[in-house]
Structure formats: structure tokens, C-alpha cells
């Protein structure tokens, strides 16, 4: 009799646990803001939208890469001594590592 009582208790607890898991698994995260009005983009109707810059930021060339020289296809150094100093520092750093 005791074994039958234990088996019924285990089955009952299993049934309750499975129902709880089934309810939890059915919860869905939705997108109510998009479904209601649609996504709000930049338009004349939405003046609070930040304006996009005309020319987006674009990083220029570093002095050490001499991009200006590369565009002109000529070896033009404004300050050759400074370039030699940079090359010496880079060579010394390479020796340290």
C-alpha cells in the first residue's frame, strides 16, 4: 500500500511539474512597439530624428604613411630629417621586442 501511495504522489508531482513547464514554454516575447505603429524612421513627419551629417567622418592619412605622396606618385618629403627620426625610433623599438 505504501509503494502505491508513493507512486501516485510521484506521478501527481510529475504531472504538475510538466504543466508548469508547458505554460512557461508558451510565453513569447513580442514586439508591440513595432506591431502597433511600425518602426519610426527619419522622415518629415518625425522632426525629432537627428539629422545625418552631409559628409560622414572619414579618417585622414597618418603623416608616417605619407598618403599625400602616394596620391601624387612622387617621393616628396617635407621634412626628411623627421622621417629619419621616426624610422630610427621604429628600428629601436623593433630591436627591443
From Swiss-Prot:
Its main location: secreted. GO terms for cellular component: apoplast. It is found in: Secreted. GO terms for molecular function: hormone activity. Disulfide bonds join 42-49, 61-67. GO terms for biological process: calcium-mediated signaling; cell-cell signaling; regulation of growth. Pfam families: RALF. Keywords: Disulfide bond, Hormone, Secreted, Signal. The keyword Disulfide bond applies. Residues 1-25 form the signal peptide. InterPro entries: RALF. Belongs to the plant rapid alkalinization factor (RALF) family. PANTHER family: PROTEIN RALF-LIKE 15-RELATED, PROTEIN RALF-LIKE 16-RELATED. Cell signaling peptide that may regulate plant stress, growth, and development. Mediates a rapid alkalinization of extracellular space by mediating a transient increase in the cytoplasmic Ca(2+) concentration leading to a calcium-dependent signaling events through a cell surface receptor and a concomitant activation of some intracellular mitogen-activated protein kinases. This is Protein RALF-like 2. The lineage of its organism: Eukaryota, Viridiplantae, Streptophyta, Embryophyta, Tracheophyta.
Amino acid at each position: 500500500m505504501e509503494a502505491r501511495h508513493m507512486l501516485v504522489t510521484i506521478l501527481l508531482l510529475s504531472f504538475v511539474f510538466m504543466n508548469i513547464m508547458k505554460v512557461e514554454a508558451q510565453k513569447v516575447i513580442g514586439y508591440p512597439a513595432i506591431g502597433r505603429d511600425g518602426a519610426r524612421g527619419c522622415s518629415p513627419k518625425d522632426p525629432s530624428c537627428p539629422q545625418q551629417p552631409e559628409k560622414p567622418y572619414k579618417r585622414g592619412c597618418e603623416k608616417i604613411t605619407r598618403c599625400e605622396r602616394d596620391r601624387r606618385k612622387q617621393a616628396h618629403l617635407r621634412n626628411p630629417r623627421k622621417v629619419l627620426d621616426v624610422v630610427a625610433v621604429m628600428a629601436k623599438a623593433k630591436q627591443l621586442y
